[in-house]
Amino acid sequence: MKTLEKYILFAIVLCCLLQLGQAIKCWDCRSDNDPKCGDPFDNSTLAITDCQQAPELEHLKGVRPTMCRKIRQKVHGEWRYFRSCAYMGEPGIEGDERFCLMRTGSYNIFMEFCTCNSKDGCNSAGIHRLGLMGVLTGTLLSVIVAHLLRQ
Protein backbone atom coordinates (compact mmCIF):
# COMPACT_ATOMS: atom_id res chain seq x y z
CA MET A 1 0.00 0.00 0.00
CA LYS A 2 1.37 3.42 -0.95
CA THR A 3 2.03 6.05 1.68
CA LEU A 4 -0.67 8.40 0.35
CA GLU A 5 -3.25 5.61 0.47
CA LYS A 6 -2.28 4.87 4.07
CA TYR A 7 -2.82 8.51 5.07
CA ILE A 8 -6.19 8.63 3.31
CA LEU A 9 -7.30 5.41 5.02
CA PHE A 10 -6.13 6.77 8.38
CA ALA A 11 -8.08 10.01 7.84
CA ILE A 12 -11.26 8.09 6.96
CA VAL A 13 -10.99 5.90 10.06
CA LEU A 14 -10.29 8.96 12.23
CA CYS A 15 -13.41 10.70 10.89
CA CYS A 16 -15.49 7.59 11.65
CA LEU A 17 -14.19 7.51 15.21
CA LEU A 18 -14.88 11.21 15.71
CA GLN A 19 -18.43 10.71 14.47
CA LEU A 20 -18.89 7.90 17.01
CA GLY A 21 -17.62 10.17 19.76
CA GLN A 22 -20.05 12.96 18.89
CA ALA A 23 -23.20 10.86 19.08
CA ILE A 24 -25.22 11.53 22.22
CA LYS A 25 -28.53 10.25 23.51
CA CYS A 26 -30.97 12.59 25.22
CA TRP A 27 -34.35 12.43 26.89
CA ASP A 28 -37.09 13.86 24.67
CA CYS A 29 -40.34 14.88 26.36
CA ARG A 30 -42.58 17.77 27.39
CA SER A 31 -44.27 18.07 30.76
CA ASP A 32 -47.43 19.50 29.17
CA ASN A 33 -47.82 16.12 27.37
CA ASP A 34 -46.29 13.87 30.05
CA PRO A 35 -46.13 14.92 33.73
CA LYS A 36 -43.21 12.49 34.27
CA CYS A 37 -41.06 14.90 32.23
CA GLY A 38 -41.18 17.49 35.03
CA ASP A 39 -39.04 17.66 38.16
CA PRO A 40 -38.52 15.25 39.76
CA PHE A 41 -37.86 13.53 36.44
CA ASP A 42 -39.26 10.01 36.04
CA ASN A 43 -37.81 8.30 32.98
CA SER A 44 -39.25 4.87 33.77
CA THR A 45 -41.65 4.96 30.81
CA LEU A 46 -39.58 7.07 28.40
CA ALA A 47 -37.15 5.83 25.78
CA ILE A 48 -33.91 7.76 25.36
CA THR A 49 -33.44 9.33 21.91
CA ASP A 50 -30.31 8.91 19.77
CA CYS A 51 -29.68 12.49 18.62
CA GLN A 52 -27.86 11.30 15.49
CA GLN A 53 -31.23 9.89 14.38
CA ALA A 54 -33.07 13.15 15.11
CA PRO A 55 -34.65 14.77 12.05
CA GLU A 56 -32.89 17.63 10.31
CA LEU A 57 -34.55 20.94 11.14
CA GLU A 58 -35.81 22.91 8.16
CA HIS A 59 -34.36 26.18 9.47
CA LEU A 60 -30.96 24.59 10.35
CA LYS A 61 -30.04 22.69 7.17
CA GLY A 62 -26.97 20.49 7.64
CA VAL A 63 -26.74 21.13 11.41
CA ARG A 64 -26.80 17.99 13.59
CA PRO A 65 -27.54 17.93 17.33
CA THR A 66 -24.45 17.55 19.52
CA MET A 67 -25.89 18.17 22.98
CA CYS A 68 -28.90 17.64 25.20
CA ARG A 69 -31.04 20.42 26.58
CA LYS A 70 -33.49 20.91 29.38
CA ILE A 71 -35.73 23.95 29.50
CA ARG A 72 -37.57 24.88 32.67
CA GLN A 73 -40.19 27.53 32.08
CA LYS A 74 -42.64 29.31 34.34
CA VAL A 75 -45.51 30.97 32.51
CA HIS A 76 -48.30 32.62 34.53
CA GLY A 77 -47.30 30.63 37.62
CA GLU A 78 -47.24 27.23 35.88
CA TRP A 79 -43.96 25.28 35.51
CA ARG A 80 -43.26 23.49 32.22
CA TYR A 81 -40.30 21.27 31.33
CA PHE A 82 -38.91 20.43 27.90
CA ARG A 83 -36.11 17.91 27.31
CA SER A 84 -34.61 17.22 23.87
CA CYS A 85 -31.54 17.14 21.64
CA ALA A 86 -29.85 20.53 21.16
CA TYR A 87 -28.63 21.70 17.76
CA MET A 88 -26.89 24.97 18.63
CA GLY A 89 -24.83 26.57 21.38
CA GLU A 90 -22.28 25.28 23.84
CA PRO A 91 -22.59 23.08 26.93
CA GLY A 92 -23.61 25.10 29.99
CA ILE A 93 -22.32 28.62 30.44
CA GLU A 94 -18.84 29.08 28.94
CA GLY A 95 -18.51 25.29 28.78
CA ASP A 96 -19.43 24.67 32.44
CA GLU A 97 -22.51 22.43 32.55
CA ARG A 98 -23.19 23.27 36.20
CA PHE A 99 -24.60 26.61 35.09
CA CYS A 100 -27.68 27.37 33.01
CA LEU A 101 -28.85 30.44 31.13
CA MET A 102 -31.68 32.17 33.02
CA ARG A 103 -34.07 34.74 31.63
CA THR A 104 -37.05 36.60 33.03
CA GLY A 105 -39.64 38.55 31.12
CA SER A 106 -42.78 40.51 31.52
CA TYR A 107 -46.08 38.83 32.39
CA ASN A 108 -44.49 36.67 35.11
CA ILE A 109 -42.36 34.58 32.70
CA PHE A 110 -39.16 32.84 33.83
CA MET A 111 -36.95 30.51 31.77
CA GLU A 112 -33.93 28.37 32.62
CA PHE A 113 -32.10 26.88 29.60
CA CYS A 114 -29.54 24.12 30.33
CA THR A 115 -27.37 22.33 27.75
CA CYS A 116 -24.95 19.44 28.26
CA ASN A 117 -22.94 16.80 26.42
CA SER A 118 -21.00 15.14 29.24
CA LYS A 119 -22.93 11.86 29.10
CA ASP A 120 -25.94 10.19 27.54
CA GLY A 121 -29.15 11.35 29.20
CA CYS A 122 -27.44 14.34 30.85
CA ASN A 123 -30.67 16.35 30.46
CA SER A 124 -32.38 14.21 33.10
CA ALA A 125 -31.72 16.75 35.83
CA GLY A 126 -28.68 17.84 36.42
CA ILE A 127 -18.42 12.06 30.51
CA HIS A 128 -19.94 11.28 27.42
CA ARG A 129 -19.15 7.63 27.09
CA LEU A 130 -19.07 5.51 23.99
CA GLY A 131 -21.14 2.38 24.36
CA LEU A 132 -19.58 -1.07 24.26
CA MET A 133 -20.20 -1.33 20.50
CA GLY A 134 -18.45 2.01 19.94
CA VAL A 135 -15.41 0.90 21.90
CA LEU A 136 -15.27 -2.46 20.11
CA THR A 137 -15.68 -0.82 16.70
CA GLY A 138 -12.95 1.72 17.46
CA THR A 139 -10.60 -1.01 18.69
CA LEU A 140 -11.23 -3.16 15.62
CA LEU A 141 -10.67 -0.23 13.26
CA SER A 142 -7.46 0.69 15.07
CA VAL A 143 -6.12 -2.86 14.72
CA ILE A 144 -6.99 -2.95 11.01
CA VAL A 145 -5.35 0.43 10.34
CA ALA A 146 -2.24 -0.53 12.31
CA HIS A 147 -1.97 -3.75 10.29
CA LEU A 148 -2.39 -1.91 6.98
CA LEU A 149 0.15 0.75 7.92
CA ARG A 150 2.75 -1.94 8.65
CA GLN A 151 2.45 -3.39 5.14
Curated annotation (Swiss-Prot):
The name crooked reflects the excessively long and convoluted tracheal dorsal trunk phenotype of mutant larvae. Should not be mistaken for the proteins crooked legs (crol) or crooked neck (crn). Keywords: Biological rhythms, Disulfide bond, Glycoprotein, GPI-anchor, Lipoprotein, Membrane, Signal, Transmembrane, Transmembrane helix. Required for septate junction assembly, possibly by organizing the preassembly and transport of septate junction proteins including dlg1/disks large 1 and Nrx-IV/Neurexin-IV. Involved in paracellular barrier functions of trachea, hindgut and salivary gland mediated by epithelial cell septate junctions. Residues 125-151 form a propeptide. Glycans are attached at residue 43. Disruption phenotype: Embryonic lethal with aberrant tracheal dorsal trunk development resulting in tracheal tube size defects. Compromised epithelial paracellular barrier function in trachea and salivary glands due to reduced and irregular septate junction formation. The gene is crok. Disulfide bonds join 26-68, 29-37, 51-85, 100-114, 116-122. This is UPAR/Ly6 domain-containing protein crok. A lipid is attached at residue 124 (GPI-anchor amidated serine). Residues 24-128 are lumenal. Residues 1-23 form the signal peptide. Residues 150-151 are cytoplasmic. It is found in: Vesicle; Membrane; Endomembrane system.
